[in-house]
Amino acid sequence: MTSLRLLLVLLLCSPSLIAAGWKAGAAKVDITPRKPIWMAGYGGRTAPSDGVLHPLWAKALALEDAQGRRAVIIATDTLGMTASLYASLKTKLTKAHNLQPAQIMINASHTHTGPVLRGGLYDIYPLNAERIKRIEEYSARLETEILNVTGAALKNLAPTTLKHGIGISRFGVNRRENKPYGDIPKLIAANALKGPVDHDVPVLAVYDGLKLKAVVFGYACHSTTLSFQKFSGDFAGFTQIALEKSHPGAVALFSPGCGADINPLPRREVSLAERYGHMLAAAVEEVLLQKMDSLKPNLTTRLKTVPLEYGALPPDEALAAAAKNPNNYRGRWAARMIQLKTTGKLPKTYPYPLQCWRVGDLLWLSMGGEVVVDYSLQFKKSFGPRTWVTSYANDVMAYIPTFRVLQEGGYEGQSSMAVYG
């Protein structure tokens, strides 16, 4: 009888007879530049970086479902992946880790206190050959670090459970409809802020038993609290620090939402970045404390490139007039547009990446570029509350306005194209 019981236990515990579930693995690596380098996001800077507020990170979360299908979320403290880096990383990740482009989601926190990357918004920065060389060197290192951290996450794959929930945090303000910014504190006090916002905080929690192994969180807001010369992940960096401190051994990853027209306001003080970061961390912690929805171990990944047509350039006379001032970013942009037209190399369309994942019954949409908030609100209205919309994903090439924003004009729908080129 004892032998029979032992045989039954062995059979029942055999891996081939246990229902397969999720596997997940997480890893992170410090990507803070080791030398002074030009910083990304603002064209008005006059000097390179001069220190570190807190480290910049590249983090990876690898997922594998019950059928062995894999996907990897890569979160970086950068302004945004450029077309050059995205193309290179797709090729290298496929070769090194057998991951197809649809299985790879590369997020950028859109921090404006990170380094300029290869091919990123060169027109707005006063770059010379030496500065570009340092940018190229750093970008090569970044690629290597991303390859390595992805490999480490895949190596760490182990049985887990995945859960999803949604919190709320209210510091994001529609920057188009609440000006001047100096009036924001009064508007907040009077509950008189205007314009669409998305204050949802989507959370994906990865558990090893009762222990939190990794957590991905999102929020639709520009990472522009800070504008000085020290590296940081802005408010989202402080959120990750707080979460990882509260959950030793866990890896926290930020997946930004459609915050192209949303700012953290008021801003420009480290104390505010820290405050917003802790507000967001508190929202994530509240979700973790509640009953979350378990996600079934089914994973599908899709990626489609859509040819978006460019609008018309300004008239030749306007370009020529602007090009006379090479010390201004619009002048540098105009000169480059003239050269592209003259050589017949002016593109008519841009290959825009749209990505769709199903993680259990969670629909996860990721969009390239800086996407305005209307998109996430509409997608969640159309597809339901279990819809997660990520922006600044894979290739950040321009602002992505809606028809409303285009009609209204302004920076997001018009003049920003000269910034992105």
Task: Outline where the language-model segments fall.
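Sec-dependent signal peptide recognition
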Residues: T2-V9
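Anionic-ligand-binding alpha/beta catalytic cores of soluble enzymes and soluble regulatory domains
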Residues: L280-A281
